[in-house]
């Protein structure tokens, strides 16, 4: 997160001809901090879960967050849950439960990883819901302040984890810089900027590239080959997530 800040400053200087990030409403700072707390919790649980469960399980389960966005929107903002959402909810979690069951994670002690992913999906849903309420704010301002507060909140899990907090090799530094540039600066900024400018189906299909890409790369890099039944339930889950995102963006 910290390494992404210089890129954001440079982009702000390029687009707005200034270094200062000026918000339209003072409440934006508070909501950015709240969103950052949820996002930091999501990332902490998600990264920890990948040491326990598979990359494909972790990514697909965490991407069920639109379901939590809709449920939380109903609870806190009385946003109606449509019949199509209920269908997407059922399809998504039939797929997820099937994926977990046929991964045999409940037998080999990896079920905890899948449970952590579900909790992470909830917190990512909180993050998305809060960010959605900042729709009138400039997307670059939102990303800057959420990134800044994530830096602060990340100190807590970092201190708990302990160990060497500074990268010890140029390879580790390169990985961190690429993550900062590609994931936080590039990914989060363009998602926030583009999500309201393209159609709901287009946004849903685009965001589904994350779990699909992660599953393919996990098979290539980590030899996490899915069985036929796992692939079937993964596709069912992705279809449910696709429907949920269409419902969420309408």
Locate predicted features.
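Hydrophobic/aromatic residues within transmembrane alpha-helices
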Residues: 49, 61, 75-77, 81, ...
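Juxtamembrane helix-entry segments on the extracytoplasmic side of multipass membrane proteins
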Residues: 23-28, 101-123, 159-178, 225-234
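Specific transmembrane alpha-helical segments of multi-pass solute transporters/efflux pumps
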Residues: 13-56, 62, 98, 180-198
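Helix-helix packing/entry segments at the starts of transmembrane helices
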Residues: 58-64, 131-151, 184-220
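Hydrophobic/small/kink-forming positions within alpha-helical transmembrane segments
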Residues: 36, 40, 44, 67-71, ...
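Transmembrane alpha-helices of multi-pass small-molecule transport proteins
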Residues: 1-41, 68, 123-127, 144-162, ...
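Alpha-helical transmembrane segments of compact multi-pass small-molecule transporters, enriched
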Residues: 2-7, 61-75, 90-91, 149-153, ...
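Hydrophobic transmembrane alpha-helices of multi-pass small-molecule transport proteins
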Residues: 8, 72, 81-103, 120-121, ...
């Amino acid at each position: 997160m910290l390494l992404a800040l210089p890129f954001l400053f440079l982009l702000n200087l390029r687009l707005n001809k200034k270094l200062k990030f000026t918000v339209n409403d003072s409440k934006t700072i508070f909501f950015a901090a709240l969103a950052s707390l949820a996002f930091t919790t999501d990332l902490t649980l998600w990264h920890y879960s990948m040491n326990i469960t598979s990359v494909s399980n972790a990514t697909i389960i965490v991407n069920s967050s639109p379901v939590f966005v809709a449920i939380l929107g109903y609870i806190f903002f009385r946003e109606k849950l449509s019949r199509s959402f209920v269908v997407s909810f059922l399809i998504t979690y039939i797929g997820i439960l099937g994926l977990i069951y046929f991964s045999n994670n409940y037998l080999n002690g990896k079920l905890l990883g899948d449970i952590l992913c579900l909790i992470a999906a909830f917190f990512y849903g909180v993050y998305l819901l809060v960010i959605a309420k900042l729709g009138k704010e400039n997307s670059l301002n939102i990303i800057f302040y959420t990134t800044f507060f994530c830096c602060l909140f990340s100190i807590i899990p970092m201190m708990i984890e302990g160990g060497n907090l500074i990268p010890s090799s140029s390879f580790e530094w390169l990985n961190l810089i690429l993550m900062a540039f590609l994931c936080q600066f590039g990914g989060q900024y363009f998602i926030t900027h583009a999500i309201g400018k393209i159609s709901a189906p287009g946004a849903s299909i685009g965001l589904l590239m994350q779990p699909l890409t992660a599953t393919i790369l996990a098979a290539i890099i980590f030899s996490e080959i899915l069985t036929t039944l796992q692939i079937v339930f993964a596709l069912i889950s992705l279809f449910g997530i696709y429907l949920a995102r269409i419902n969420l963006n309408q």
